[in-house]
Swiss-Prot record:
Sequence similarity: Belongs to the ABC transporter superfamily. ABCG family. PDR (TC 3.A.1.205) subfamily.
Species of provenance: Schizosaccharomyces pombe (strain 972 / ATCC 24843) (Fission yeast)
Keyword Protease appears in the UniProt entry: no
Alphabetical list of InterPro entries matching this protein: AAA+_ATPase (IPR003593), ABC2_TM (IPR013525), ABC_transporter-like_ATP-bd (IPR003439), ABCG_PDR_1 (IPR034001), ABCG_PDR_2 (IPR034003), P-loop_NTPase (IPR027417), PDR_CDR_ABC (IPR010929)
Domain ABC transmembrane type-2 per the UniProt entry, residue ranges: 412-622, 1071-1286
GO molecular function, one term: ATP hydrolysis activity
Listed transmembrane segments: 431-451, 466-486, 512-532, 543-563, 572-592, 680-700, 1095-1115, 1166-1186, 1208-1228, 1245-1265, 1361-1381
Keyword tags: ATP-binding, Endoplasmic reticulum, Membrane, Nucleotide-binding, Repeat, Transmembrane, Transmembrane helix, Transport
Subcellular location: Endoplasmic reticulum membrane
SMART domains to which the protein is assigned, alphabetical: AAA
Protein name as it appears in the record: ATP-binding cassette transporter pdr1
Amino acid sequence: MSEQEKGKGDLDDPNSKNTKCPDKFEQKVEEYLEVLNELHLTGRTSGFCMRNFTVEGAFNPKFQIRSFFAQLLHPINIIFRTGPKRDIIPLVKGFDGYLQPGSSLLVLGHEGSGGSTLLKALCGIVEENERLNGSLHYDGLDYKIAHSQFKADLSYCGEGHSKVATITVRRLLEFVCSCRLPASKYDHPRSHYIRRICEIIRDAFDLGDFYNHRILRVFNSGDQIKVDVAQTMCARPLIQCWDNNMRDFDSISVIDILSRIKVLSHKLGTTLVAIVSQASDRIFHMFDMVTLMYEGEQIFYGPTSRLKPYFLDLGFIPAKHSTTVEFVTSLTYPEMRIINKKHQGFIPSTPAEFRECWLRSEDYAKLIKFMDRYEENHSDIHAFKDAKFDQTRLQKFLRWLNSNPCLIPYRLQVFATAKVTFFQYLHDYSYIATFVFTYVFQALMLGSLFYNLRNESSELYSRGSVLSNAIVFTAIQTMSEVDIIFLKKSLFKEHRVQSLYHPSAALMGSSLVEFPMRIVVVTMYDIIVYFLSDLKRNARSFFIFYLFTIVITFCMSAVFRFIALLSTTAEIAALIGGIGALVLIIFCGAVMPVQYIGWWFRWIAYANPVNYGYESIMLNEFDGREIPCSLMAPAPDTAPIENNFCLATAGRTGTSIVSGYQYLQVVYQYKADFLWRNCGIILGFAIFILASSLILANFIRYDRESVHIPEFQKRKSYSQVASSFLIEPQDKPPSQTEPDNKKVDVSTTLSTNDNLVLCWRDLNFTVVTKTSKKQILTNVSGYLKKNTLTALLGENKSGKSVLLRILSQRGIAGSVEGEITLSGLKNPKNLRKRIGYVRKNPLFISEYTVRETLRLHAALRQSKQRSLSEQYAYVEYVIDFLGLGEVADFIVGDMGKGLSLYHKRLLSIAVELSARPGSILLLDEPANGLDSQSAWMLVCILQKLARSGLSILCSVSQPSSRILELFDMMLILDLNGNTVYYDTMGRDLSKLVNYFKRIHGTNEHSKDTADFVLHCIQFLKQGPEFDYAGAWASTNTHKQIIEHVNFIMDNPELTDDDFPNETRFMTSFFFQIYKISMRNFVAYWRDSSLLRARVAFNIVAGLIIGFSFYKQGVGVEETQNKMFSAYMLTVASTSTMNGLQPKFIYFRSIYEQYEQNTAIYSRTAFIIAFFLVEAVINCCFATLFFFGWYYPSGFYEFNHNIPFYGGFAWLMLMIFTLYYTTLGIGIATISPSIGTASIISGTAFVFIQYFNGMIQLPGVIVGFWKWMDALSPYKYFLEGMIGGVLHDAPITCEKFEIHYVDPPPNYSCGEYFSSFLNSSGHGIVYNPEAYSSCQYCPYKNADELMVGFGYHYNHKWRNFCIMIGYTAFNLGAAIALYYIIHKTPWKRLAARFVPD
């Protein structure tokens, strides 16, 4: 018998009982095997063998916070090599071990010990900064070959891995199965086997009909892990690695899931490697082999039966009642080791010494002997390689055998990804509705604005405007591809690791689905716009227009997908996308004809597909059109037509008809022969970019990750930090804030003088849905007294979190009945402030340090009677008390970055303590996901807090006996929310054990008392075989507790007078704004990628607009180009407006999920503080934009008073910056997600800018929309801006802009035009003394040209004040809307709390 077989745990063993899967599951697995046999897909197995295997990473081990300025200097550091050097650090050092097919391995070690890195390396997931050394082979097949050609056989499932969120279980499993079922000839169609396999797997995991129509996004965590296992079962990997996926589950659920995985491993012969936090003895003995890692060093590898004896022989002894896992993981914490004093030999202390002892041990020698034997059986590597290829020949398409790790041909990959994309959109109703609404709404807006255009020369501008807006809108809407691709990048990475498909196949498949969707909405858009605006009414013209909008959509969709693939971060993608949209609009030919673009940028116009599309639809509309003149000049009523001309661009003398083609030649220099040529050019662009994207997709790295390194803030001393902008000047160390330098005792500081008793009686909680009514809590009663630590136990969905939220008075949707008192006082004032509550996964500002986070909460939540220095001194005592001193200046970070999970849990406790809530503290599963030793240390800290005077109620889901012994009392709930135990537990948990022995009628129980208790809890869900709640209710202990609860409530020790009349918030409104503004500013300052993207956009956009209109002349068309230069400022503002919304929604999520319920600050202060920081940042960056735009555009050349006009233009830009900042905040306030905010922002921008005076001239706006002309803020901004920069700017007509006409006999040109000039009020005759060939220019200065757009220079200060009013209105509306939406029932329903 092999060593691994000896190490296997017996399922009937007391330490592993009740780990057997349901019979239904084993039956379904047998059915699954029958199908695989029928398909000839069984018999493939593989183990692995590692020898001196090392994973090295290159990084800077002391990674300081890089602020915005530091990031700006980063390129210089790279060039001159002045930045921090990267060290090569071994993450996994010299790992030895092997695992036979069908066996299982448990990887132990504290967080950061290298376990996750080992599992990823085993599955071929190696990051850019990592490299593998040593030997690793899979039954003789070298890891380099396996990782490149057989990656699909290696499955890694990490915590929080990506899924297709808007798809049903059935469709997901069919997708995975279709990607892993070879394209061979079978007895039945391939689709038949796919459906059959998926039905079996869904039945096996109880994911039947109820889940078929539910998308994965609404699943709870328990169902999600079932889906993960089912997905892995469909993929049929040879080696499975599970990286702590079950960290949020209770032990019962973990055992259930692992038992299913074990059965699959045994039946299919797959090899299992797993990391399980807080593994009980039952879980531990489910594995065959175990390895223990200590800071990257392997200090044990062998059968599970040898783990504990090995370390006992080394001279260590376990703590009382500790599990095997607790014992061995405690050895990786030097302060937790218990040394056997009778041991005579050497006792290791450092990781290197543990490693040396392991290398000299007999267990290591046995391991090497078994490894040698294993390698001998697979010594002929090449022969096994050939055999391996022979075994997989059926499972690979022959042409791809030696190069492609995917099992199906490319065309089937495209089909599978297209199918899953289709169903993904089919179930994403909100996206489809928003997608269609956006196109239809914009079409109705544009079509109605240009409704029924007349065939007159006065509407030549309008006809061109509707065409330009139509083509630009369809192009700009494809920018959503950037967001779509970025959402899919993590999915691409995961599926690429699993070798389900090539990323290029997914890109092609999604294009095949999304492009027809766009064709549908573009068709609707084109029909509405084309026929409402009365463009050329014939079939040929319509279908040409339709064709070019379609090809432009296709081309620009490919362009923005290419941009998203090239971008490494969302900020870079937004930057490139924003610049791309700006360039697309400027150089499309509509804003400025190509001939006016400087040679330095003209190549961009030729590389812009929209330019060719605009040219073609303009030719399609104007070529062959004869347009009657709206106004003949100068004397149509008194002089013959030969002495008049048409006052329109391209108007001719002696005729009242304007040729549409002549108009295009004069204004744009378009040629009719280019119409179909342009179509070919656009398609060429599209095909080239699409092909480039498909090639690029297979070679770029998705979702790059780096080694987890905490970031810290460099602090030389407290006094230096106090002088910086990060911390207030009052901030000083305790020795400086207290003149007498008196040391405050920690225990006294943390305890309180009150003896508050939290008491609750007959609590019931019910959640009502559309289809059912569920009782979560049923008649729960109890109390918390001082110096007591109480455990709250129960399965998932038993109501633990609900009870804690009700007791803490945190918001929860549902019906609550019962009484809650504080020392007998019902409904005391501000009860929420007197109870500390640590939620399950609290959210903090990731850019803040630990110390800064605690100081913020102390300053905002402690009483105003304490000075800021006292509050900060108290924070230092909390840091010392909880042992956070070493990480006090580390960045908190996000998921997977920043602080370790253990320190984040300590931080959540420290935050509540720093607020000094009172003597009551409630915690919702604070130890979840921690390793056994970290969980024990955290509960020890809770015990220490309880002994210092706090009353603590803490829910736990994966306790061990050693952890349970730290509690004083235990409250157990069943799945119906009934109390089944609430009492002390006795010495060594004897009272608790005896109670459950008595009601079960047994005298035996597991050696692990916690296992026995959890085993009893497991029976609570197996039906009404026994009334556990009734049994407890009949006990004397329960009756005594109820009597005590009644006594407390009937004899209150407090009155309302005992509580001071406090306001809802502890601090003043302005202090809240100040502290939150400083917090937000620090977060922005340290989120350097965001600020870099913004500053780069403002500089680049300003320079692009400025130099696009550089050295424009003084002709009519060139002056109009300068007006469009100012118009482009409004277009550029949309990128900044969209850029602030993700940050607002991020801050809002923290506020709504955590800070709001703790009454830290008001929502008004939240919005104003966010606005102040955004206003400062945006105004600073807008100033950079202004200089890049104003001076290259040459506006200063026309102003005789440069300081005033330039200063006024800057002032208008600043108030406009504040306007769109508040507009973006207001839209984000009412938006549930970033995507929705982006869509609403785009729709609002287009709606407002349609009435800015430059899209449709005010004089020809249809009657229905005339009211919007007076309401558009962009109209007032552009009027003020353009009036300021172009006031008194002279106009000298170019030759083609001058109208030539002969006056009647005996009339000079001046005499002939005098009446017309007086009546029209604009224009100039260049040769008034001449009697022939009069030269008339329509405008003599820019002010006359601006009048046609409805702009007047004299309105400049009025416009400035109106913009101030709009800004104030937006800010007030944002505050009001946030309050209204938060208070409405549907908002509470949308934020409904899902019980645990």
